[in-house]
UniProtKB/Swiss-Prot annotation:
GO molecular function, one term: protein homodimerization activity
Gene: hemF
Domain of life: Bacteria
Protein's recorded name: Oxygen-dependent coproporphyrinogen-III oxidase
KW Oxidoreductase (keyword) present: yes
Site entry: Important for dimerization: H183
Subunit structure: Homodimer.
Amino acid sequence: MQEKISKFEDFLTQLQQNITTALEQHETNAAKFISDKWQKPDTPDQKLKGYGNSMIIEGGEIFEKGVVAFSRVHGSELPPSATAKRQELAGKSFIATGLSLVIHPRNPFVPTSHANFRIFIAGADTDNPIWWFGGGFDLTPYYPFEEDAIHWHQTAKNICDKHDKTYYPKFKKWCDEYFYLKHRDECRGVGGLFFDDLNDKSFDECFNFVTDCANSYLDAYIPIVAQRKNIEYSQKHKDFQLYRRGRYVEFNLVFDRGTIFGLQSGGRTESILSSMPPMATWKYNWQPELGSEEEKVYQYIKPRDWIK
């Protein structure tokens, strides 16, 4: 099992380089991804041990902030967030390896994107370790372009159909349900793919699906960035982007499993919260004007079948 974990780690660290390089090619000022390598001290008082590399870009003309973060951690006991639905895992040691990214563009017409790909192994030090993969990618637009959502979902469907034709409808629905703010009765964006507890096939089959899915993120996102990054925008557009970013913050702090897992397990706070946008605003009881561009996004982000 250790060999398989290391193989996935090698894939993720190379993917991190591929993604940061591709995004930098669209940046028009001197902003670059900066590498922040870290290691948790291996001491008895540390609940979580391990290492990682958080790559951050800030202050770009295209990307106001972005993080592409790799981590490999292990602990003696899974935190409550990881065992809430799987009580049989309570008390087991674990290894978790993953890559998580969030890109916050400056231009309000370029959507925010998020992706995450990970493996968990519970009881890795036992004769019968339990493994599963999780991950996916989702898109959060501030202004609606239907062709962008169609391209995003078509890319997701193509990669799913290559492995299992039941995956896209199942993981698309799961994504719509997961990235939902209950207290707002709103979806975070137009979705994409979300899956967890993936071990329905052999390890190699699941590994191949997850790595193909991860490699398709750039195919899904870069064409949208290229198409929208030079659209002129006003302060009104920027203000609405900042307001909608507030929803992103609310979801990450209240509902996101990765954030909750990281904080409960004693993870590296600076890396866990690096996905937060650089700026966000809240306005009391604000409502968009009827028929405005801003109102349209509330219909646009409702779950629908994007691929006819």
